[in-house]
From Swiss-Prot:
Any one of the GO BP annotations: rRNA base methylation
Source organism per UniProt: Escherichia coli (strain SMS-3-5 / SECEC)
Keyword Cell cycle: no
Reactions it catalyzes: adenosine(1618) in 23S rRNA + S-adenosyl-L-methionine = N(6)-methyladenosine(1618) in 23S rRNA + S-adenosyl-L-homocysteine + H(+)
Name of this protein: Ribosomal RNA large subunit methyltransferase F
Source organism, top-level taxon: Bacteria
A single GO cellular-component term on record: cytoplasm
HAMAP family: 23SrRNA_methyltr_F
Documented EC number(s): 2.1.1.181
UniProtKB keywords: Cytoplasm, Methyltransferase, rRNA processing, S-adenosyl-L-methionine, Transferase
Cellular compartment(s): Cytoplasm
Length: 308
């Protein structure tokens, strides 16, 4: 009997426990990382970053038709079910303008990362087209390698380097471009020291040695920025005003509920017409994203029905 994970979006493909026998057939590397729980059930050694990477390879190949996926050491290895949840909830948000899922949406991923995870899921699940921005040339090279290694993705995903220090949308959204939505998983910590402390806590909780903790723990731009998550999203909100007619919905993950009030204040200051909070849950982990738009209901309907 398969147990369901509480809180996942109804369209998320990962409600049931992992079918490890099938996933090991898809990616035989995964077999070496299987372990038994105290209850005698087969599981994956989630404390081992190499095991998580092998699991991701199998999940992306089996569920999302991404046969060739890899990331360099030192970059974040994201949990696939949680990333998929953001995509599915975003699809629901876009559907509110017309009452049906938007099949040909154009999405901007701020900080696409070396893993390119959101575009990979969004292209497969909804046929969306993505532009991914990134400050790190190494991350961009990794994401491009994934795109090039999987047939069809070159037509659906394009990448852009953010060359302007501190900018988010400026320099990425071109003059005559339009996007149905933006998405972002912002850096959480406010300093390198805080990021190291967070990684150390995670290492101790998982029982990792220091060498293991370095694998897929995350790069500086993935983990921290000056002022942390709130400062990053505030900057995003302030910049978004300049693209009010080119983007229907701006969205960002927010890691902590207590970070919302200062963000709501900035959204009021910039004149956002509508603000939405979407709560999500993956097992015991609670998360959320906020979305804001400068368009009213009729303007959003017209935007969705524009010539593409």
């Amino acid at each position: 009997m398969s147990a369901q994970k509480p809180g996942l979006h109804p369209r998320n493909r990962h409600h049931s426990r992992y079918d490890l026998a099938t996933l090991c057939q898809v990616n035989p590397e995964l077999r070496q990382f299987l372990t038994l729980t105290p209850a005698g059930e087969q599981s994956v050694d989630f404390a081992n970053p190499l095991a998580v990477k092998a699991l991701n390879k199998a999940l992306l190949a089996h569920f999302y038709a991404v046969a060739n996926w890899d990331i360099p050491d030192g970059f974040l290895c994201p949990p696939v079910p949680g990333r998929a949840d953001y995509i599915h909830h975003l699809a629901d948000l876009l559907a509110e303008a017309t009452g049906s899922i938007l099949a040909n949406a154009s999405i901007l991923d701020i900080g696409v990362g070396a893993n390119c995870i959101y575009p990979l899921i969004g292209v497969h699940e909804y046929g969306w087209r993505f532009t991914g921005s990134e400050t790190s040339s190494q991350a961009l090279s990794s994401a491009q390698a994934i795109i090039s290694a999987n047939p069809g993705l070159n037509r659906a995903i394009r990448l852009r380097r953010q060359k302007e220090s501190g900018a988010i949308f400026n320099g990425i959204i071109h003059k005559n471009e339009q996007y149905d939505a933006t998405l972002c998983n912002p850096p959480f910590h406010d300093s390198a020291a805080a990021a190291r402390a967070g990684s150390e806590r995670k290492r101790r909780n998982l029982g990792l040695n220091k060498d293991d903790a370095l694998n897929f723990g995350g790069q500086q731009q993935e983990l921290w920025c000056e002022g942390g998550e709130v400062a990053f999203i505030k900057k995003m909100i302030e910049e978004s005003k300049g693209f009010a007619k080119q983007v229907m919905w701006f969205t960002s993950l927010v890691s902590r509920g207590e970070n919302l009030p200062p963000l709501y204040r900035v959204l009021t200051e910039v004149g956002a017409v509508k603000v939405v909070k979407k709560e999500m849950a993956q097992g015991q982990k609670q998360s959320r994203f906020i979305a804001w738009t400068f368009m009213n209901d009729e303007q959003r309907r017209r935007f969705v029905n524009r010539q593409r």
